[in-house]
Amino acid sequence: MHVTLVEINVKQDKLDEFIEVFRLNHLGSIKEAGNLRFDVLRDENIPTRFYIYEAYVDENAANTHKQTSHYLKCVEQLESLISEPRKKRSFIGVMPEIK
């Protein structure tokens, strides 16, 4: 399992727009064949900070995600909504095991 954790810091006055832009990416992502999870989380202490937890069956599926129209459109639209570049960390999922 290939997991990516993305931190996104949104401009205070762009929160509602961010939610709508990211909702479309979320809805497209959860329909992808290799997607296991695509969670959008909001920091309870910093309301302008979001974390995206993406789990795919393997790195190839994660890379395929980055070529989808919903992902590319989201990345383009995020540029005017975020206060700093996105931060990404990749992980190898150990549990649960994929069978």
Swiss-Prot record:
Alphabetically ordered keywords of this record: Cytoplasm, Isomerase
One Gene Ontology term, aspect cellular component: cytosol
Chief location of this protein within or outside the cell: cytoplasm
Every ABM domain range: 2-91
SUPFAM superfamilies from the UniProt entry: Dimeric alpha+beta barrel (SSF54909)
Database matches in PROSITE patterns: ABM
Subcellular location(s) of the protein: Cytoplasm
Catalyses which reaction(s): (2S)-2-hydroxy-3,4-dioxopentyl phosphate = 3-hydroxy-2,4-dioxopentyl phosphate
Residues of the signal peptide: none
Molecular functions (GO terms): (4S)-4-hydroxy-5-phosphonooxypentane-2,3-dione isomerase activity; oxidoreductase activity
InterPro entries: ABM_dom, AI-2_Isomerase_LsrG, Dimeric_a/b-barrel, LsrG
EC number in record: 5.3.1.32
Function: Involved in the degradation of phospho-AI-2, thereby terminating induction of the lsr operon and closing the AI-2 signaling cycle. Catalyzes the conversion of (4S)-4-hydroxy-5-phosphonooxypentane-2,3-dione (P-DPD) to 3-hydroxy-5-phosphonooxypentane-2,4-dione (P-HPD).
Protein family: Belongs to the LsrG family.
Assembly mode: Homodimer.
Name of the protein in question: (4S)-4-hydroxy-5-phosphonooxypentane-2,3-dione isomerase
Organism whose genome encodes this protein: Photorhabdus laumondii subsp. laumondii (strain DSM 15139 / CIP 105565 / TT01) (Photorhabdus luminescens subsp. laumondii)
